[in-house]
């Protein structure tokens, strides 16, 4: 009898595991929604923008940071230059495909770094500003897909699990409007399912090329009260000269 109960329990566990598996149709739908979020955004081809950050940490005064970003999304090229504060002016990052360097204008040296690196002293990482619809299928598996509501919006709720070392977090959950594929909320988790970070995007602006998340709030869930607000401005979609995506460009700014 005991052996029978153990065997029955194992069968029930296996059955529940199979039942809990996500269907291929939901996997395909989830990836399609994630890719649609990239298509809906205005960032296609060449663009530049000013990124202003307000960093809040308990017991410290607010810190203001400002960067200029240049990106050529089709070729995975990106240059990020710090404009403020004055003491850090000229610091930057350069991306060419999977190679990423940080630049220090004082030592005039480039250091190979990771897309997981935080920008300045903020809660924003380099991969947060990367625009690429190819990154979803290449770097994630779909763990769950469902529909629900967030505030007044019906949303897709998609949980992705990292399958490469590229993503900054082991798991991320996205809340995406069903009428227009815009991400309203993102929750990032550790490998043990601990909530590490929450991103809220309360404001989008419509421009001819698509939508732009002009106001973004990033909360550090490990350090309560610590958050970064990001504001996007001065967005342009003019063709950028090739030299902007070179080490010589960063070196020539100072």
Task: Identify the role of each PLM range.
Residues 50-56, 83, 159-163, 218:
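Generic short beta-strand segments
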Residues 16-20:
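Sec/Tat signal peptide C-region and signal peptidase I cleavage site
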Residues 45-79:
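N-terminal, post-signal-peptide region of Sec/Tat-exported proteins
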Residues 65-105, 112:
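Mid-chain, structured segments of secreted extracytoplasmic proteins
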Residues 4-14:
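Sec-dependent N-terminal signal peptides
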Residues 111, 131, 151-247:
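Gly/Pro-enriched, hydrophobic low-complexity segments
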Residues 40-46, 206-210:
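Edge/loop elements at the starts and ends of beta-strands within beta-rich repeat scaffolds
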Residues 21-36, 42-45, 52, 61, ...:
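Flexible, processing/modification-adjacent segments and terminal tails
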């Amino acid at each position: 009898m005991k052996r029978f109960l153990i065997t029955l329990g194992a069968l029930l566990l296996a059955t529940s595991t199979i039942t809990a598996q996500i269907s291929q149709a939901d996997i395909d739908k989830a990836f399609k929604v994630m890719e649609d979020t990239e298509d809906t955004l205005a960032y296609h081809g060449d663009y530049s923008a000013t990124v202003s950050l307000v960093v809040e940490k308990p017991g410290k005064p607010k810190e203001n940071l400002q960067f200029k970003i240049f990106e050529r999304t089709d070729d995975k090229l990106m240059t990020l230059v710090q404009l403020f504060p004055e003491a850090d002016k000229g610091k930057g990052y350069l991306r060419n495909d999977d190679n990423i360097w940080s630049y220090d204008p004082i030592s005039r040296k480039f250091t190979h770094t990771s897309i997981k690196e935080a920008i300045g002293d903020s809660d924003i990482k380099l991969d947060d500003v990367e625009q690429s619809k190819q990154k979803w299928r290449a770097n994630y598996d779909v763990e769950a897909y469902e529909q629900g509501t967030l505030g007044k919006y019906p949303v897709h709720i998609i949980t992705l699990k990292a399958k490469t070392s590229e993503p900054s977090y082991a798991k991320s959950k996205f809340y995406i409007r069903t009428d227009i594929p815009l991400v309203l909320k993102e929750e990032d988790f550790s490998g043990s399912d601990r909530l590490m970070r929450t991103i809220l995007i309360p404001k989008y602006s419509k421009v001819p090329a698509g939508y732009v998340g002009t106001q973004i709030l990033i909360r550090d869930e490990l350090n309560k009260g610590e958050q970064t607000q990001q504001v996007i401005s001065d967005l342009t979609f003019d063709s950028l000269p090739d030299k902007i995506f070179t080490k010589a460009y960063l070196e020539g700014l100072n």
